[in-house]
């Protein structure tokens, strides 16, 4: 329900929201996910060094939901957003996100996200 609600609010397909989160969080058990509530590999500030002695460049969120909302807000600030808003094509969205530099390995990331979307019938 969260991905569907965010999809309606932000115009980003739920399949893309879920596909990226599944890949970036290793379906939930990743360290970023567990310690930072970060399901999307978004870089930013955190307090893990101070609280646990762990140095990381990834952003910390108060809740899982906050991570999902931040991903959607991040998409609204991308150049491609106006032309793709409310477009249901996962392929076009993933290609645009990849091309915009979301990942350090865009071609591999794109393949993996699209594969995740297909594999989970999103």
Region locations from a protein language model:
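Catalytic cores of secreted/periplasmic lytic hydrolases that degrade extracellular macromolecules
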Residues: 1-122
């Amino acid at each position: 329900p969260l991905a569907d609600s965010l999809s309606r609010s932000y115009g980003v397909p739920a399949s893309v929201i879920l596909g990226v989160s599944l890949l970036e969080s290793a379906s939930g058990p990743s360290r970023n996910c567990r310690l930072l509530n970060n399901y999307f590999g978004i870089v930013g500030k955190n307090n893990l060094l101070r609280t646990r002695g762990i140095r990381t460049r990834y952003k910390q969120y108060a809740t899982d939901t906050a991570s999902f909302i931040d991903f959607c807000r991040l998409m609204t600030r991308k150049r491609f957003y106006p032309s793709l808003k409310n477009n249901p094509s996962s392929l076009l969205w993933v290609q645009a996100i990849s091309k915009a530099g979301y990942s350090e390995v865009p071609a591999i990331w794109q393949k993996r996200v699209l594969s995740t979307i297909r594999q989970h019938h999103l």
